[in-house]
């Protein structure tokens, strides 16, 4: 019997992460910025970046940042994510060889939206005309546990047998909009020990930057534009003028990371007393790693620096890879 072929998609408010095995059974990872713009009609000059779904036309990824803000789909709520989901799934299936190539598509939801699974499946089925059972929905954050216990802090195949893993760990999966936090005891997590918190992700940095730019320069920018400025360490170019917002980006990022540490203390303080580590995955891991030296005094108010574990590489792919591995186990 032929091995199933599964595509795993972690569609987030900041980026889209994909994982699958190619014809040589080698893991493939790919990432796109999730910016999505819906345009009224196709323009000849846009042919390379346009994607059509039904009678609608979209610009996806980095090219969408150049489209007027009024045409960009707002990605700061569940409704925005729901709107772009079928567009990206359709695009990715086409990109990777078509629906018939894959046995299943594994997708995930933040625990903050765990009651939205049926709504998402209804949307995908109605828009794409694909049966609901073609999709497998898995929990973000919680699924990262699978990769951690198999691969530790490095998802390279050669590094599977490392000794960085601990049995009692708080997993913090920080995305753009949400934080998913999972308390793992003796290698096991229960649904009662996991939470998802909306509007607690790195979008908090972007909110502050949007407010600062408007107050300082009288210029309105979108949350997605602010995200790009943060990703570019504060470099911002508008109408030929270059702005240096590196000081503000650093300040807002450090303030946000301190808030995350305080949130962990407030919600999991007693649990932390009996744990061996905090594992930080997702996009937030990049910021913790980048600002670790400046953040050390704040971290040590709660626990020693060694208490924090961060993947060596590809921290943003722990969910997508976890979806892939879990889906293969479910399909058999």
Task: Briefly describe each language-model feature range.
Residues 175-234:
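Aromatic-anchored, glycine/proline-accented short structural segments
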Residues 1-169, 188-202, 227, 236-241, ...:
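Nucleotide/phosphate-binding catalytic cleft detector across ATP-hydrolyzing
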């Amino acid at each position: 019997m032929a091995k199933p072929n599964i595509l795993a998609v972690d569609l987030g408010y900041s980026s889209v992460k994909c994982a699958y095995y190619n014809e040589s059974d080698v893991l493939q990872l790919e990432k796109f910025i999730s910016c999505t713009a819906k345009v009224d009609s196709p323009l000849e000059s846009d042919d390379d970046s346009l994607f059509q779904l039904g009678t609608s036309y979209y610009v996806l990824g980095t090219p969408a940042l150049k489209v007027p803000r009024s045409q960009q789909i707002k990605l700061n709520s569940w409704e925005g994510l729901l709107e772009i989901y079928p567009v990206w799934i359709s695009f990715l299936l086409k990109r990777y060889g078509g629906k018939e190539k894959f046995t299943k598509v594994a997708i995930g939801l933040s625990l903050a939206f765990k009651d939205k699974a049926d709504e998402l499946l209804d949307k995908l089925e109605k828009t794409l005309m694909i049966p609901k059972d073609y999709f497998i929905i898995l929990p973000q954050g919680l699924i990262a546990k699978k990769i951690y216990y198999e691969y530790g802090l490095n998802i390279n195949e050669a590094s599977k047998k490392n000794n960085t893993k601990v049995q009692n760990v708080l997993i913090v999966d920080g995305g753009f909009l949400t934080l998913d936090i999972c308390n793992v005891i003796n290698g096991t997590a229960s649904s009662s020990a996991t939470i998802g918190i909306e509007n607690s992700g790195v979008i908090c940095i972007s909110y502050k930057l949007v407010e600062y730019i408007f107050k300082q320069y009288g210029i309105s920018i979108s949350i997605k534009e602010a995200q790009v400025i943060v990703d570019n360490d504060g470099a911002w170019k508008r109408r030929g003028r270059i702005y240096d917002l590196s000081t503000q980006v650093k300040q807002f990022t450090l303030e946000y990371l301190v808030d995350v540490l305080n949130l962990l203390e407030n919600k999991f303080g007693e649990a932390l007393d009996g744990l061996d580590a905090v594992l930080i995955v997702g996009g937030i891991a990049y910021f913790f790693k980048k600002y670790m030296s400046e953040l050390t005094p704040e971290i040590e108010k709660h626990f020693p620096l060694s208490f924090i574990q961060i993947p060596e590489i590809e921290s943003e792919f722990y969910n997508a890879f976890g979806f892939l591995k879990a889906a293969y186990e479910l399909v058999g």
